[in-house]
Amino acid sequence: MGLTKKKVLVGMSGGVDSSVAAYLLKEQGYEVIGATMQIWQEDKEVEEREGGCCSLSAVEDARRVCDKLDIPFYVLNFRDSFKKKVIEPFIQEYIDGRTPNPCIECNKHLKFDELLRKAQGIGVDYIATGHYAKIDKKDDRYMLIRSDDDRKDQTYALYNFTQDQLAHTLMPCGEYTKDRIREIAKEIGLAVHNKKDSEEICFISDNDHGKYILNAKPGAVKSGNFVDKSGNILGKHKGIVYYTIGQRKGLGLSVGRPVFVTDINPKTNEVVIGAEEDIFKTELIAGDLNFITFDKLEKEIEVEAKIRYSARPGKATIVPLKDGRVKVVFNEKQRAITKGQSVVFYNGNIVIGGGVIEAII
């Protein structure tokens, strides 16, 4: 009597990474099931023009891949959860003068929480995705580790993993470079082998988040003043949701020198403008923390910290505060630390944890 194969549900976006992840896991001997999370419904005209990563065309791409791999495929309805846990907080964060990262919230609440629970509810052992990251076990603790392809590493968006979630998650693409993943897809005859990577926010097909928020909550977007750090009025802005810390383009100001957004004040509806040197800071406060390598930060430790997806990690010290948050002190000034973005802590290639930036000091 043979051993029963372990079952894995692969979250499939219709892209090359999750498609090859499904193939690799089947080759490794798992019983693979493909599933696409239906999270947003574009109107037909936009759908046909844009074809984003959660669109109907993406669902069809995923279905065709599963047919090719001879594995079952399902579409799971996550629309209500996505709206409540990703879209509505995304809109509110911008209205509150912060710059959110919806991918992190989607990973935290949907992919590695609700999807995992749904999978376990039907007797599936693991979930898997096409993320570029690795999971390993050291002693009695699961670790999240940077991908072998440094350019494509996605651990910044994955720091909210719990130990139980890591124990039931597989990420086979983390062992490969992106180029090799595309080669594998071509070798096995997948039509998505040359499909371009999705770079926009998946539920905003034209990548214009300001217009999206204006349409969703028109009364919440109001014109206000651009001011300098002394409070002098420099001009009019079209609504704080259109701006982020460090922004230079699209301000519509003519003051005779390059100027940048240095702060956003939702209480006064003002956007503060200054010189580039004003957006370089060394300290921040972060909350909504999650740690992977240990349960709780008991004392200050030295780390490498990353303040946005595209940033290089900088050496820093994280200090626990009495209110449960942490202070992060960088050795060198960081450009455009932004409230609402996450700060993620590393020890070499190992993800220590992270949190959401709440204040810049």
UniProtKB/Swiss-Prot annotation:
Residues 152-154, 308-309 are annotated as: Interaction with tRNA. Pfam families: tRNA_Me_trans, tRNA_Me_trans_C, tRNA_Me_trans_M. The keyword Disulfide bond applies. Disulfide bonds join 106-202. Belongs to the MnmA/TRMU family. This is tRNA-specific 2-thiouridylase MnmA. Catalyzes the 2-thiolation of uridine at the wobble position (U34) of tRNA, leading to the formation of s(2)U34. GO terms for biological process: tRNA wobble position uridine thiolation. It catalyses: S-sulfanyl-L-cysteinyl-[protein] + uridine(34) in tRNA + AH2 + ATP = 2-thiouridine(34) in tRNA + L-cysteinyl-[protein] + A + AMP + diphosphate + H(+). It comes from Clostridium botulinum (strain Eklund 17B / Type B). ATP binds at residues 11-18, 37, 130. GO terms for cellular component: cytoplasm. GO terms for molecular function: ATP binding; tRNA binding; tRNA-uridine 2-sulfurtransferase activity. Its EC number is 2.8.1.13. PANTHER family: MITOCHONDRIAL TRNA-SPECIFIC 2-THIOURIDYLASE 1, TRNA 5-METHYLAMINOMETHYL-2-THIOURIDYLATE -METHYLTRANSFERASE.
